[in-house]
Amino acid sequence: MFCRTPTAFLNFHSSKAHRVLYAFFRSGTMALSTPVPPASLLEEMVVPSRQLFGPGPSNMADTIADAQHRNLLGHLHPEFIKIMADTRLGLQYVFKTKNSYTFAVSGTGHSGMECALVNLLERGDRFLVVEIGLWGKRAADLAIRMGIDVNIVAAPHGEAIEEYKPQVVFVCHGESSTGVVQPLDGIGEICHQTGALLLVDTVASLGGARFDADALGVDCVYSATQKVLNAPPGLAPISFSDRAIEKIRNRKTRVASFYFDALELGNYWGCDAEIKRYHHTAPISTVYALRTALAIVAKEGIDASIDRHYQNAQLIYKLLEANSLEPFVEKEEWRLPCLTTVKVPAGVDWKEVADDLMAEGVEIAGGLGPTVGKIWRIGTFGLNSDKTKIEQVISLLARAVKKRCNL
C-alpha cells in the first residue's frame, strides 16, 4: 500500500490496518531469513587452459589480456576519451573506411546486427536478405520482428535487387555456420543504382579475409572482437557511411532503441562535432583490450594479416587432403580463410571426435543450424593462424577420426 497524500498517510497510520500490520511485524512472522551463500561460489574459480580452434572466441594474446588489468578510468575521463579515439582510428583502419560514424557497440557481434537493423530499417521499408547460412536467417528473423517486409534470396543477383527495390540489402561476408566467404564485388554499385543501402556482416571475416568497406560501397558493416582480433567478446565494431547516416537522420520514426541509436552512440564516441553527451557506461576494460588488439593488427599490417590467413588456409587444405579428409566448401574461392569446415566421414560421430580433441586441450566445434552433425568447424583466427598450431590441430583431428573409423 502506497500513501500518496499526507491525509491518506494520517488516515492509514491511525487505522486498524496499520495496527494489525504493526503487530504482525513485531511478532517476527515476516522476519527476513539470512540466505546461505552458494557453496560453489565460495570455491576458487577454475579456468582451464585451452587452444580455442572453434568458431570463436579465439585465444587472446598476453598483451590483450594484460590490457584488461589496467586501472579503471571513468567513462568520460579525458584519458579514456583518448583511448576511444584511438580505437575509432583502429576500426577505420581494419574496415578500410573513412566513415566518421565508426565506433564499437557495447555488446557482442549480435548487438552489431541489431544496431544496424534498428537504425537502417523502419516499418514500410523492404529488406532483401542474401541467405548463405544461419546469419542471413537471423537477420531476416530480426527484421520480421520489427514488422519489416523481408525477402530472402540465395545469391545477390542484381535482378532481385531491381525486382524487390529494397531500402536495405543484407549480405554475410563470412558465414561461420558453413565456412563460406561471399564475394561482394559489384553488389554495392547495384544497390546504389536502385537507391538501396548495402549492409554487411563481417563478424567472422574482419582481418582474416579481403574486405574494403569504401571500395566495395558498403553502407553499414559490423563485426565482433572475439574472432580474428583475438580480443574478448563484448564489443561490436560498426561503421555507417554518409548515405546510411543520411537515411537515419531522415527517418519517419525515431529509432526504437535508445541504447542502439547510432546518432547517440556516434556522439558518445566522438563521431560528430557536438559536445559529447552521456549515453551509457562503456565496458572500459574491454575497450582497452580492443584498442590493444587493433594495435597488434596495425603493427603487422591489415593486408599482411589477411595474406597470412589465406596462406595458412592453403596449408589446412593440404593437410586435410593428406589425411583423407574433405573440406565442406568445394570451391576454393568460396572458402572462408580463417574458418575451415570439414566434412564428417560416414559412420563417425562428430561429437566423439571433438571430445577427443577437447581431452587434449584443443577445441573444435560441430556444425551450426543446417550443418549440425555434418561438419567440424575449425577456426584459425588471428594468432591461431599459425603453421605449428595448425599442424597440431589437424594431426589431432586425423588421429581421432582414424581411431573412430577403426573401432
Question: At which residue positions do the language-model features occur?
Answer:
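N-terminal "arm"/small-domain region of PLP-dependent enzymes with the aminotransferase-like
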Residues: 31-78
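Active-site C-terminal subdomain of aminotransferase-like
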Residues: 59-60, 226-317
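Conserved N-terminal alpha-helix of the aminotransferase class I/II PLP-enzyme fold
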Residues: 67-115, 134, 138-144
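Conserved PLP-anchoring active-site segment centered on the Schiff-base-forming lysine
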Residues: 121-137
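Active-site phosphate-binding strand-loop segment of PLP-dependent enzymes
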Residues: 158-205, 220, 228
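Conserved active-site segment immediately N-terminal to the catalytic lysine
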Residues: 214-226, 236
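Conserved PLP-binding catalytic core of the aspartate aminotransferase-like
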Residues: 326-357
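PLP-dependent enzyme catalytic core of the Aspartate aminotransferase-like
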Residues: 370, 374-407
